[in-house]
């Protein structure tokens, strides 16, 4: 179910359009007729306002009829039934009959296979169809290609019986505001797709329930109270699941329930309340609580494990299918900023003060920054052995791992590991909390670095390293302690051993997901408490997991700690879990909360979405009781804070005295894939009529070399060689016989990839374009197709008589290129197979090296414009020459899509490395934001790396020791 709201697209203007009154004076109607007309007009107005308007990708606007939900259509006696309903109900009945007829010994494996098959049809089958529809509009192309919805009266529908069957099926289900013939093809395709979804979803749920029935039993020795408790909990989860589904359908209707936005959009805002304020993606998260309720009632680990597998498959469906479509459809990149980054002015100012990169030039003082720093080398989620923080973390973790594995699990070592974990937890919460509190009130951390001539950015970098090291070591020590306290169960079938491990692993997975969601919402800046260090204008937003919870780390962020308690079943781990939870809550209340109140004030939200949903469902008496409890808790917290504030000066004085005394005493004493499909019969196709001609932007200059032999050989070949710019679009003109197959296609390959000139044995990896429109079930195969089957006069290369052939033009650009240097060729293939009919002349794609011979690298004012001039065209190529992304000059900022898709920055750093011999991380390109900043960075890198440069340009090179 696509859960993102549709973007309004001018529907209000369409609904509110007024028709101009006639100039002719009409006679006044009688009063009764006038009142009747007014009531009719009012009714029509209300009806019009209640209508929903849809919009297809080509801009067609239509009225979206009202449809009923799946269960009502199938099971309600009042709803009209058609043949597809009878088919679905028959298949469901066959499932039930199969359960009753099978022997008890094979019921469980048979229904496990049946359920997993239907689940695969759901997550893999429907997922593939939706993926293809989202990216290539495949389902609509199939319908158009088969002419399913073309009226047979026109004589163009080859399937008139199927047309009448589909028409009868759909019009039976939608009796009002729907006409099969006039509905857009996208809407009709969606309705047919719905019927397939109904079959799969109903069979999926039915087979799951029947599998649970087959596995259901009462555990041996289970008491009546435990059984009643198990059934009560299971029934509650199933009822909760039912409420989630009903409330979700109330909010999103059939449009999102059946993934309607993969086919068309609706012109209205969808409001998300109820269950959508409770949890992210409720249909796929809390919406599967019923699976675990049924597992409880069945008292079967088989049902539990297959439920976990199905739930995991559903999350994979969400991540791989729905989320990319939602991101593409509703989260379009913002327009490009036309204002040059303020850092550019700073760079220019530095350049104007000093026109040369002299080594004795005094570096400018760091400029204090009050805005949020932009991360170019994220600390979380990346390991770089060139950073002292990462090396320190790696070495400490290796030490913990070695000590944990080598040492025995005796009581003494267990005590040591638990004590070590407790100390690290105290430091992580209390020690880090103290540093942040001092930073919030006095800027103590920043003042320390300013004292020694460093800037705020250096203080921020060092703080991130300290926090990252403390956090990772805290959890590493906890894992080591859990390992020492854990013992394998002697009998997995005894007691709740399996259940403890399953629940524990689930809680650990929940904490990992929560941490990832928090980092995704806060980013690097928020993860490391950046608002304690940078005083930017307070702007508080609640997105991601914070839409549902104010402090997710308070409960969900420590779920894995309690998961370890369940798995180890150890009192020592209970102590560590209680200590961790207590210190984390204290950190939130005593450090984070006061700083947030000081920084954001009244803009802080009191209740999160989950709390609001729960409060709305409470009766008035409980609401009043809850308000009283909140008041008591707030007053208690304020009292504790007052006590701490009062005692703080005395404690500080005592600590200072202790530090002074201790200091006095001490003074004394960190592949290739081979895919070949061949056409068996090529008779009737004139091979000499096939040809390929390559055109493109030729490289303006060749690499210079002092090697005279190489220069001579290059100059002799320049008239023959075709050398094209890196990333520039390549035009291919083709010819073929008039009877050539409409499924011919042209692919781009490296010359060295195919040894045969008759057969292509290597996959094009998506770098191919069809010669004719509509021949393949993919729109991406037509991206770059400019013309086809244009009849021209053709002589060929053998001076034969002139003959007529079909011709066309295609352009390879963007993802159709290899984005690499080398020698390439185009291959013309026959009838969707891999028979080669023609091969283009080989051509080379090369990145011209920056010429340093004639440019004085010591003069910044000269070298920077030269670098900008060399960078601009190749960066425009790397950004697909898209006017919304690629800059038109050195000062213009890159489009926001560069930050969202790493492929652009990877292309740029590849080009920079081969042009200038300097390797940058892709994040550097995003951080610089325009050509001028990147050129400034290259200039500095050239200066820093000059003693190690291997170029033959004038200037400093690597010193060579003379004998």
UniProtKB/Swiss-Prot annotation:
Biological process annotations from GO: methylation; phosphatidylcholine biosynthetic process
Predominant subcellular localization, coarse grouping: endoplasmic reticulum
Pathway membership: Phospholipid metabolism; phosphatidylcholine biosynthesis
Polar residues bias (residue ranges): 352-373
Pfam family, one: PEMT
Topological category with respect to the lipid bilayer: Multi-pass membrane protein
Origin: domain of life: Eukaryota
Record Gene3D superfamilies: 2.60.40.2840
Gene Ontology molecular-function annotations: phosphatidylethanolamine N-methyltransferase activity
Ranges annotated as spanning the membrane: 86-106, 110-130, 196-216, 224-244, 278-298, 301-321, 388-408, 415-435, 465-487, 492-512, 572-592
Annotated Basic and acidic residues bias: 38-52
Record has Cell inner membrane as a keyword: no
InterPro entries the record matches: Phopholipid_MeTrfase, Phosphatid-EA_MeTrfase_fun
Location relative to the cell: Endoplasmic reticulum membrane
EC number(s) reported in the record: 2.1.1.17
Lumenal side: 1-85, 131-195, 245-277, 322-387, 436-464, 513-571
Residues in the Cytoplasmic compartment per record: 107-109, 217-223, 299-300, 409-414, 488-491, 593-963
Catalytic activity field: a 1,2-diacyl-sn-glycero-3-phosphoethanolamine + S-adenosyl-L-methionine = a 1,2-diacyl-sn-glycero-3-phospho-N-methylethanolamine + S-adenosyl-L-homocysteine + H(+)
Annotated function: Catalyzes the first step of the methylation pathway of phosphatidylcholine biosynthesis, the SAM-dependent methylation of phosphatidylethanolamine (PE) to phosphatidylmonomethylethanolamine (PMME).
Family as reported in the entry's similarity comment: Belongs to the class VI-like SAM-binding methyltransferase superfamily. CHO2 family.
PANTHER family with a match to the protein in the record: PHOSPHATIDYLETHANOLAMINE N-METHYLTRANSFERASE
Name of protein: Phosphatidylethanolamine N-methyltransferase
Biological source species: Coccidioides posadasii (strain C735)
Gene designation: CHO2
